[in-house]
Swiss-Prot record:
Pfam families: DEAD, Helicase_C, zf-HIT. The Q motif is unique to and characteristic of the DEAD box family of RNA helicases and controls ATP binding and hydrolysis. GO terms for molecular function: ATP binding; ATP hydrolysis activity; RNA binding; RNA helicase activity; zinc ion binding. It is an enzyme of class 3 (hydrolase). This is DEAD-box ATP-dependent RNA helicase 41. Keywords: ATP-binding, Helicase, Hydrolase, Metal-binding, Nucleotide-binding, RNA-binding, Zinc, Zinc-finger. A motif (DEAD box) lies at residues 267-270. It catalyses: ATP + H2O = ADP + phosphate + H(+). A motif (Q motif) lies at residues 110-138. CDD domains: DEADc_DDX59, SF2_C_DEAD, zf-HIT_DDX59.
Length: 505
């Protein structure tokens, strides 16, 4: 043992930083924190570590485990009158699918009062209009309240945000009631989301549900001064909500106490991976002390499942319906229109009282295209339209959203910045002007036309430029009983025939 409290496997020179350590060779011990070569053994825990930095991180985890309830210490109390058979029947009726941990997964609840939530939180839910939980909330909330890690999937607009905010607020409230002398007010939970708009929305909902409780939030996104965000955290908050890039930037420049984080949430995790945030997410996670992990997404891919497995050893999978198929509440109308005719077709729709159902969102593929099309709509049709995309300043984006959601502007032209997560409560029509690059993104985009199962319409422009999506698009249209343009059928059949010839059928 040396003076730093580490027993070296080989050398007596103790490395200070994890980055200074090499990767392990076959058969060599691995650091329990970062998986680099576990050159040393921590005296206090007898675990392999690679450096003093990782030893300190390990000891913080141990201290955190002494302070906080174990994951088996439930905030949710199972109804003694319910049986596993009753739970199976209810799940079958509501199309709820659960995998992992078997009987450890609590049954779905039919009311929020069944979850053992603080009375003030129940009142806030009622005031906010949450009369009864949605299917994803019925299963995800009690599962999350047990402290187990969770990967949950449901249609866009199905209430996923409350599915993680309710457990977070409940756990934070319980923690403060059990530790009244703790005046530090260090963060107890963190939510990461892929866009600034979604982060703003999550914080708004968190403030509404946490009103009157010992629950404060900090919004950490680009476009706002970092100094104000840092000051807010230093004043004491329970929940940090931010985009991965901004949170990494904040942590790299300032010391933020994250050892008390009990719950770590990734919202719209598939979108986060698509945007290349995986490394930043992992960097943030490694700064935490083994929190409960909650992942939410409208679609589930192998990559999403892989990320879930890397963040939590054991994870419960909860899905409502088929997470990779279009929302059945959205009526899809596919229109074959050549690229040069798309603008005129859009103008015709917006002029038609039969086809235009404002307020509507028009999705395009480029930021410049969004600005130009919004201006053209206003000039040509007389229908006021605004655009929104990632290049606009945060204040302007907030003003645009306020005008649209407030009913001042009937048409919003958007890039994929609004394709994920953001609640567009007033929208019942989506026009897909430019097809997304993947069918999963298409499913997200048209899902904006429905909220909480209410009927909506998605008008989709299709032409030969979208050839790579034809088979998946036909399947998506068929799954909801939508009519398929004959041009799309003919070209899809021809593509399949040529493919068979190429592979030797």
């Amino acid at each position: 043992m040396n003076e730093e409290g580490c027993v070296p496997h080989n050398s007596d020179v103790v490395k200070q930083k994890s980055i200074d350590q090499r990767a392990p060779l076959s058969g060599e011990p691995k650091c329990v924190i970062c998986s680099r070569y576990g050159e040393y053994i921590c005296d206090e825990t007898n675990d392999d570590v690679c450096s003093l930095e990782c030893k300190q991180a390990l000891l913080r985890r141990v201290d955190s485990a002494r302070v906080f309830p174990a994951t088996d210490e439930c905030f949710y109390v199972r109804d003694p009158g319910s049986s596993s058979h009753d739970a199976q029947l209810l799940r079958r009726k509501l199309d709820i699918h659960v995998q992992g941990q078997g009987s450890a997964v609590p049954p779905p609840v039919l009311t929020f009062t069944s979850c053992g939530l603080p009375p003030k939180l129940l009142l806030n839910l009622e005031t906010a209009g949450y009369d009864f939980p949605t299917p994803i909330q019925m299963q995800a909330i009690p599962a999350a309240l047990t402290g187990k890690s969770l990967l949950a999937s449901a249609d866009t607009g199905s209430g996923k945000t409350a599915s993680f905010l309710v457990p977070i607020i409940s756990r934070c409230t319980t923690y403060h009631s059990e530790h009244p002398s703790d005046q530090r007010r260090n963060p107890l939970a963190m939510v990461l989301a892929p866009t600034r708009e979604l982060c703003v929305q999550v914080e708004d909902q968190a403030k509404m549900l946490g009103k009157g409780l010992p629950f404060k939030t900090a919004l950490v996104v680009g476009g706002d001064p970092m100094s104000g965000q840092l000051y807010r955290i230093q004043q004491g908050v329970e929940l940090i909500i931010g985009t991965p890039g901004r949170v990494v930037d904040l942590l790299s420049k300032h010391t933020i106490e994250l050892d008390n984080i009990m719950t770590f949430v990734l919202d719209e995790v598939d979108c986060m991976l698509q945007r290349g945030f995986r490394d930043q997410v992992m960097q943030i996670f490694q700064a935490l002390s083994q929190p409960q992990v909650l992942l939410f997404s409208a679609t589930i891919s192998r990559e999403v499942e892989k990320v879930g497995g890397s963040l939590a050893k054991e994870i419960i999978l909860v899905s409502i319906g088929n997470p990779n198929k279009p929302n059945k509440a959205v009526n899809q109308l596919a229109i074959w229109v050549d690229a040069k005719q798309k603008k005129q077709k859009l103008f015709d729709i917006l002029r038609s009282q039969n086809h235009f159902k404002p307020p509507a969102v028009v999705y395009v593929s480029s930021r410049v295209g969004a600005d130009l099309l919004a201006n053209a709509i206003t000039v040509v049709t007389g229908v006021k339209a605004l655009s929104i995309h990632g290049e606009k300043p945060m204040k302007e984006r907030r003003d645009v959203m306020g005008s649209f959601l407030g009913g001042e502007v009937p048409v919003l032209v958007s890039t994929g910045v609004l394709g994920r997560g953001v609640d567009l409560l007033v929208v019942r029509q989506v026009i897909v002007f430019d097809m997304p690059s993947t069918i999963k993104e298409y499913i997200h985009v048209i899902g904006r036309a429905s909220r909480m199962g209410e009927k909506g319409t998605a008008i989709v422009f299709v032409n030969e430029d979208d050839r790579n999506l034809f088979p998946d698009l036909v399947a998506a249209l068929k799954s909801s009983g939508a009519a398929i343009p004959k041009e799309l059928i003919n070209l899809t059949s021809r593509e399949m025939h040529n493919k068979k010839r190429r592979v030797g059928y």
